[in-house]
A protein has these predicted regions:
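Short glycine-rich anion-binding loops that position phosphate/pyrophosphate groups of nucleotides
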Residues: 110-112, 145-146
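Extreme N-terminal basic, low-complexity initiation segments
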Residues: 2-6
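N-terminal beta1-alpha1-beta2 submodule of the flavodoxin-like/Rossmannoid cofactor-binding fold
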Residues: 7-10, 17-107, 113-129
Length: 164
């Protein structure tokens, strides 16, 4: 899907996903960029997506995961009891932003045939409130320096498993 096609879908009218009534023409868009390289291809595409969404009058927040402190999930499942992860880092705010968003853009470079570690770590940490983000509209930005189509497809399938 091209950026233009994605933005066309983004501007289509849909019902708001939150209890707060929003203008049907405007959506709350969260972009999660996981590239550790500020001038990398996936981060650059995130910036282009953001520019188009702002131009279309959407509210946009971009989070660069490499700039955040996000610990890996330890599998303790303390979150199942309290609804919040026991770890004190930036992921709690990111998860709140994911819940508040109508649209979530997941962007990653392909490293060693799959999404990069920063994205995988963030996805793993959504376990506390995973069911509150599955009804969102998702877009994927996946870049690779290799022409190996299977690596791109594998990464997209990983995202689809998370978003379905």
């Amino acid at each position: 899907m091209t950026t233009a096609e994605a933005l066309s879908l983004l501007t289509a009218k849909t019902e708001p996903h939150s209890e707060v009534e929003r203008n049907e023409m405007s959506k709350k868009v969260l972009i999660l960029s996981s590239s550790p390289r500020k001038k990398g291809n996936s981060n650059t595409l995130c910036d282009r997506f953001m520019e188009g969404a702002i131009e279309a009058s959407h509210e946009v927040e971009k989070v660069v995961l490499a700039e955040k402190k996000i610990n890996y999930c330890t599998g303790c499942y303390a979150c199942k009891k309290t609804g919040r992860c026991a770890q004190k880092d930036d992921m709690a705010q990111i998860l709140d932003s994911m819940i508040a968003a109508d649209v979530i853009v997941l962007a990653t470079p392909v490293y060693f045939y799959t999404m990069c570690a920063q994205m995988k770590t963030a996805i793993d940490r959504t376990v506390a409130k995973y069911t509150k983000i599955t009804d969102k509209q998702f877009y994927f930005i996946v870049t690779a320096a290799d022409s190996n189509k299977a690596a791109l497809e594998r990464t997209i399938e990983g995202f689809r498993g998370f978003t379905s």
